Amino acid sequence: MILFFGMFSAQKNADLIITNAKIYTVNQSFDTAESMAVLNGKIIGVGKTADILKNFKSKNIQNLEGKTVFPGLIDAHCHFTGFATDKWKCQLWGTKSWDEIIARISDYAKTAPKEWIYGRGWDQNDWAIKEFPNKEKLDQLFPNRPVYLKRIDGHAAVANQKALDIAGITKDSKILGGEIELKDGKLTGMLVDNAMTLVEKYIPDIEDKMAIQYFSELQKECFSYGLTSLHDCGITEKTLGLLEKAQAQNSLQMKIFALMEDNPAYYDRWIKKGRYTNKNITVGGFKVYSDGALGSRGACLNHDYSDKKGWRGFLLSDRKHFENLAKRLKNSDLQMATHAIGDSANRTILQIYDEVLCGKNDRRWRIEHAQIIDKNDFDLFGKYSIIPSVQPTHATSDMYWAEDRLGKDRLKYAYAYEDLLKQNGWLPLGTDFPVEEISPLKTFYSAVARKDSKHFPANGFQKENALTREQAIRGMTIWAAKAAFQEKEIGSLEPGKSADFIIVDQDLMTVSEDQILDTKVLETFSNGKKVF
């Protein structure tokens, strides 16, 4: 195989030539090549080393001595800006008990310069006592300072009495699409989904210059994992402005496909404006939340939770809200990307999409997560051309307790990635970081092995829904690009596309399954320039 922009009688200049590599082009045929030439950030030739050196010349020739090259990896669902601006908060990821959290925030409170004590990352499912915390200890330690600690999934939080008072929350407060937890008629401090907004609007934003600094720092981490593009789900106009400012200052090189948050104040402006691109930043649609998360029992189910009788979760807005937005977006070139975890939420959004789009189409409207699907609803994705955008590490993070929530029968139809892939023949993959870790290698491993990082369980979790290695790589490259209408620019190593690629120390397509997570990204290139 050799692919050029035409055949040349004389050597053409290139900024960079890669030779003696094993290059997975991830083109339609999944061809491999040995060599690649790059000019002005674009790929101008791919083929055998001898042919590339015959047709191109460069002062920068990199002999990879057999190392493996993949297209730059794309995260099809994450919260880049949200995670970056969480950096000033108390980090609660990996905590194993409520006591450990109390210790962390007590230390943080001594050094934090802001009045609010704001933390994120706890998960009660990792504790010996798998129950939501309450505010009692927080009230004792911080009676005059507001405390707000968000769960790992971003769909629940515990607040102390000071924070509740600032927000005006009492035992009689109610909100659509959220839960203000009471026990014995008293506030516990637990807030789920929309109830969280009552407090969050009072928490001050970080300074713009700090946000831009954190974008740059998080970008470096993403590049180190081989990510060259990502889909940032649910950002504000202010955040978009900060991204563009960071890009203008040359502190942001990451390709970002942004989905705006579901804010009615944005509708007219963005529907009129349509799809928007500023260099590496593209706004392509709206991110909408239909329900909450399974871990905090906010996912909207068709039947009761197996571990909470009489409770089915809830939709975060009434059906009319989703219908009206879908109808408005139909007349634009913007995508609708709706978070749906529970089988009831997924069915609701599938039905609304069908009512608006009327069957087969190429609008590429998405359902983010598509986590629990009623067995009778899978074919609706294919019937209506709806794209499930999934995060394989959710399966291996939730597998320890998901059966408690769903029972054996429903669990069979959860995290069913192979079944979902069959519907349209392609499936974009992401991480949902910071809910999960940034590493796309863990996405790959979870998708193909259905195991956690300790290689548990031995036979894989519901292995019948594992993806092949080729499917997983496509999901992290060309299919992720396709989910954003960017497959002509990025996602594979072909002439005319951006020279976004990574060099790794072992071949993910052939290395033994238990060695996948040992793979190291050696170098990352974006637009032909080395960024890691």
Protein language model annotation of sequence segments:
Residues 1-13:
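Bacterial Sec-dependent N-terminal signal peptides
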Residues 13-19, 24, 28-269, 284, ...:
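Divalent metal-binding segments
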Residues 23, 43, 67, 124, ...:
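Short, glycine-/Ser/Thr-/acidic-enriched flexible segments
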Residues 77, 385, 500:
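Active-site-proximal glycine-rich helix-loop-beta segment
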Residues 144, 278, 308, 380-397:
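Extended low-complexity acidic/polar segments
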Residues 247-250, 273-281, 358-360, 381-385:
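Acidic (Asp/Glu)-rich catalytic clusters
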Residues 274-276, 511-516:
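Short proline/glycine-enriched turn/loop segments at secondary-structure junctions
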Residues 327-337, 344-365, 369-370, 375-379, ...:
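His/Asp/Glu-enriched, well-ordered alpha-helical/loop segment
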